[in-house]
Swiss-Prot record:
It comes from Mycobacterium leprae (strain TN). It comes from the Bacteria. This is Serine/threonine-protein kinase PknG. It catalyses: L-seryl-[protein] + ATP = O-phospho-L-seryl-[protein] + ADP + H(+); L-threonyl-[protein] + ATP = O-phospho-L-threonyl-[protein] + ADP + H(+). Residues 1-32 are annotated as: Disordered. Its EC number is 2.7.11.1.
Length: 763
């Protein structure tokens, strides 16, 4: 199946080439259509290759038959989290356009960017005539031509035989050719919009200077730079590139609309491409034109194509890109890492959201009511940071964005599949301990020791358990600080005090330059509850710390300890917006909301737990919220998700039993709930802590319930479900508790209770 022309979507009418003037200049850049794609988009597998078999040579010859490598139909991306169907590479000849015509909707003047060559502009729309394919722009007078400059059969540079057109972009037609000097391998020739465009010619010359050094497995390979005379005899430069036989990420549906990808799939694709951008940035280059059309999915990998817009970082002059994807500040700053990060965010948005369009181009911003953004909160936060109008607030590097994308992907896949996808953070430690795990069962300790126990969560419990920012390995004091990471707060302060006095400075390191050392002191002070000293040190660090998020995190912790929950929420949210793929700020926000009595942020307990089932504090927090909202069934289900391998499994089982029965009148409880609670206790060894008191609780609830209800005859916890049997069970449980009571007074109390509840003896 051959293609008549390129994709018909509306968001990309043409690229813009903007002149990025030096900061001292005042000239505004002009728009120029510079879209540069050299592979059409194939909508589905019906467009893929059906290879014809050549005639067989019947003469006997010695031949080596190459082994055929069979690839599995499914491939895994995103660290193995996402499975996609493997696409087949497309035969080059199948990519040829049978009628290489640029649609009128995509015809723009290369000089001023205004529409040209359109029937409605020439008064021909009524009679059905088409607009002129070449002529002069009615707005600026520049000549334009949308006709191919090369024809099938043309030989370029005495080496490349042109087969035809495969795409058209702002930089002109893109041609398929066969290289006669290298076994007739298929190559791609990318020409320019117009041979008279001096800036475009200069762009091609510039490409020759630095594109040859670009070598990366995720970037299309440049083979050669050649020239060929156009129809007027003027030389036109062409870049000879590797042919990529796949399909772009821009997919069209059967109805002609742009098909959106699942969020997990889109993230997985971008995770494959970000290393290529990181590589370009490392050698001082910016890609400038990331968009779905320029990402090719092949049988074995993803590749960036079309290097026509690549430029040096902070270069000024003619800067190419696509409206709707291009960062707004690029005319002022020139190409930067931040402008590339912006295109990554816009590409993710274009792949997954129904972006608004105007005049056929994507509008800035995001559709906040899009169901994708409301369903995947972390993904929405990531997009907002990537396309922040202030480039300083975007991700600082492709590596940083990749790390956060991976965290968001884990959340998305866990949410979609219901299977936790835990992963290690690159900037936060694991949880140092747990909080709120035994709050609900702790009040049953009154059976054990006779004292009332609080069921309230405290800020200190949270602070000492929360994750903490990891030590920056580039900090001068990092080797010293690594030894104090797991120390107790007092020991940490002693070690840091010794380090400040040079006692640990054996290698002559000037620890006065360290930022991490005072931050470690802040952490230890907060663990000790000394908020005043911690805040004083944070104030001293305000002008020294480049990574402000660390200060914001510790400010939030200090606010939590002082009871300023609104300020703590604000600061934790700021950290979350900076690192949307991290679980640490989500857990902190959920715990802060619980202390404040707010329910808005309880969703983060759910997010953390469903993403990483090793953070059991989140499971118990979610269960507490569900129970408080009257959803005891949901709370029990959450507690049942704690895996048997967790050291808190027993506590979860006991808590679920208490959740079923505690704080409810007998007319709110069913026999099934009583038996369910009993089964949870019965499966645990009697030597486990708190099992005896929970047995007493269950049997006591059953005894009270039976006073007004009828029960089946089956035993419960080894006793008949009768008034006599349950009294025997409660008596036995209380006497067992009396044997392990910590004080004589409480032991006598338990024995008295047992005597009161024992069934009446008959002689």
């Amino acid at each position: 199946m051959k293609r008549e022309h390129m994709d018909h979507d509306t968001e990309d009418v043409g690229q813009a080439a903007q002149r990025a003037d030096p900061p001292s200049g005042t000239t505004e850049g002009r728009l120029q259509s510079t879209q540069a794609i050299f592979r059409p988009n194939f909508d589905d597998d019906d467009d893929l290759l059906h290879i014809s078999v050549p005639s067989v040579d019947t003469e006997p010859q010695d031949r080596i038959t190459p082994a055929t490598r069979v690839l599995p139909p499914i491939r895994q991306l995103g660290g193995g989290l996402v499975e996609i169907r493997r696409v087949r590479d497309i035969d080059p000849l199948e990519a040829l356009m049978t009628n290489p015509v640029v649609p009128e909707s995509k015809r723009f003047c290369w000089n001023c960017g205004r529409p040209v060559g359109r029937s409605e502009l020439e008064g021909q729309e009524a009679d059905g005539a088409q607009g002129a394919k070449e002529g002069w722009c009615p707005y600026c007078g520049s000549p334009y031509s949308f006709l191919p400059q090369l024809s099938p059969g043309d030989i370029v540079a005495g080496q490349y035989e042109v087969k035809g057109c495969i795409a058209h972009g702002g930089l002109g037609w893109v041609y398929l050719a066969f290289d006669h000097n290298v076994n007739d391998r298929p190559v791609v020739l990318k020409g320019l919009v117009h041979s008279g465009d001096a800036e475009a010619q200069a762009s091609a010359v510039a490409e020759r200077q630095f594109l040859a050094e670009v070598v990366h497995p995720q970037i299309v390979q440049i083979f050669n730079f050649v020239e060929h005379k156009d129809t007027s005899g003027d030389p036109v430069g062409y870049i000879v590139m590797e042919y990529i036989g796949g399909r772009s990420l821009k997919r069209g549906s059967k109805k002609g609309n742009v098909e959106k990808l699942p969020v997990a799939e889109a993230i997985a694709y971008l995770l494959e491409i970000l290393p290529a951008l990181s590589y370009l940035h490392s050698i001082g280059l910016v890609y400038n034109d990331l968009k779905p059309e320029n990402i090719m999915l092949t049988e074995e990998q993803l590749k960036l194509i079309d290097l026509g817009a690549v430029s040096r970082i902070n270069s000024f002059g003619c800067i190419y890109g696509t409206p709707g994807y291009q960062a707004p500040e690029i005319v002022r700053t020139g190409p930067t890492v931040a402008t590339d990060i912006y295109t990554v965010g816009r590409t993710l948005a274009a792949l997954t959201l129904n972006l608004r369009t105007r005049n056929g181009r994507y509008m800035d911003g995001l559709p906040e009511d899009d169901p994708v953004l409301t369903t995947y909160d972390s993904f929405a936060r990531l997009l907002h940071r990537a396309i922040n109008p202030d480039p300083r607030r975007r991700f600082s590097s492709a590596e940083e964005m990749s790390a956060q994308l991976m965290g968001v992907l884990r959340e998305v896949v866990a949410q979609d599949t219901g299977v936790p996808r835990a992963g290690l953070s690159t900037i936060f430690s694991p949880s140092r301990s747990t909080f709120g795990v035994d709050l609900l069962v702790a009040h049953t300790d009154v059976y054990l020791d006779g004292r009332l126990h609080s069921e309230k969560l405290t800020a200190k419990d949270i602070v000492t358990a929360l994750q903490v920012p990891l030590v920056d390995p580039t900090d001068v004091a990092a080797p010293v600080l690594q030894a104090t990471v797991l120390s107790q707060p007092v020991q940490t302060l002693d070690s840091l005090r010794a380090a400040r006095h040079g006692m640990l400075d054996a290698q002559g390191i000037d620890l006065a330059e360290s930022v991490e050392l005072p931050l470690m002191e802040v952490r230890a002070l907060l663990d000790l509850g000394d908020v005043v000293k911690a805040n004083r040190k944070l104030d001293d660090l305000a002008d020294r710390v480049s990574c402000q998020w660390r200060l914001v995190w510790y400010r939030a912790v200090a606010d939590l300890l002082t009871g300023d929950y609104a300020s703590a929420t604000k600061h934790f949210t700021e950290v979350l917006n900076t690192f949307p793929g991290e679980l640490a700020p989500k857990l902190a926000l959920a715990a802060t909301a619980e202390l404040a009595g707010e329910s808005d942020e309880h969703k983060f307990y759910r997010t953390v737990w469903h993403t990483n089932d090793g953070v059991v504090s989140a499971a118990f927090g979610l269960a507490r919220f569900q129970s408080a909202e009257g959803d005891r069934t949901g709370a029990v289900c959450t507690l049942d998700e704690v895996p048997p391998t967790s050291r808190h499994f027993t506590t979860a089982r006991l808590t679920s039993a208490v959740t079923l029965l505690s704080g409810r009148s007998t007319n709110e409880i069913t026999e099934q709930q009583i038996r369910d609670a009993a089964r949870r206790v019965e499966t645990l060894p009697p030597t486990e802590p708190r099992v005896l008191q929970i047995r007493a609780l269950v049997l006591g609830c059953a005894m009270d319930w039976l006073a007004d209800n009828q029960a089946s005859a089956n035993h419960i916890l080894g006793f008949p479900f009768t008034k006599h049997g349950l009294r025997l069970g409660v008596e036995a449980s209380l006497r067992s508790l009396a044997r392990v009571a910590p004080t004589q007074r409480h032991r006598y109390t338990l024995v008295d209770m047992a005597n009161k509840v024992r069934p009446t003896s008959t002689l």
